[in-house]
Amino acid sequence: MNRITSLFGIKYPVIQGGMVWCSGWRLASAVSNAGGLGLLSAGSMHPETLREHIRKCRAATHHSFGVNIPLMYPQIEEIMQIVVDEGVRIVFTSAGNPTTWTAWLKQHGITVVHVVSSSRFAMKAEAAGVDAIVAEGFEAGGHNGREETTTLCLIPAVRAVTSLPLIAAGGIATGEAILAMRALGADGVQVGTRFALTEESSASEVFKEYCLHLKEGDTRLLLKKLSPVRLARGNFQQAVAAAEAAGATEEDLRILLSRGRAKRGIFEGDLEEGELEIGQVSALLNEKGIQTVAEVMDELVTGYQQACETLAANVCERWDV
């Protein structure tokens, strides 16, 4: 066991990202049943829908699971009360100030993890009293940090300023990547894109198949005047890029985003007008196809073990100094 498996009561230090329109009870329970930590995404659920998913997830697994809550959620008070009322034991917070809710959640016996994109925000999260930190790099899909720091650079930077349990996120889809993050100082990893494209994900099959054919360079980080989002190539990505190049104001960009674009793209599979949020690592998955969560977890665990053995046998030679 390590600090992440001990903190959450799980077998493997692998957390499934709480992704809008992907992370419902089927995905979260499947990840938890496979030995990781499944997360429900409150960001794309009405409060009572979240309550329903919490109950269905609990019925589908006797293992630990949690809820990811964007702190900018418009009905945040109602969402927070629901997770307390439903007995949720683990909450990941993101997109907001962790000082607002951390103490209240911990008073109710909830383990709190906050997602950051820089060492500066990591220090603020630790000061707020969180139990662990997710450091998410530039490679990640969906909402991202303004710093544009890659995971390779971010993890050691965050490790240098905090002793809290640290979870690496962004661009992680293989066992080898997990080992790399461990070498950089992370105690565990959060995997988004790989789980978003599984059978149990609530994303549209059209969206999944589209993302499994993306190539390097097919995703871009846009909407930096608002909240940076990594988007896959398509009409909406082109429209946003053109608007930004033409000097669009924040209000102009909000109008572009105001028609439920993420739901249309991810959940409904509208490749023409929808917002297609996915990570850079999708380009490594072209040969995978849509897999089950169990298959993905087995590949991650086996790949990690094999990478450890390969390094021990062939790579980690001593250098004369």
What are these regions (language model features)?
Residues C22, I172-A173:
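Residue-level detector of alpha-helix initiation sites
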Residues G145-I167, A173-V321:
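Conserved active-site-proximal phosphate/metal-binding subdomains
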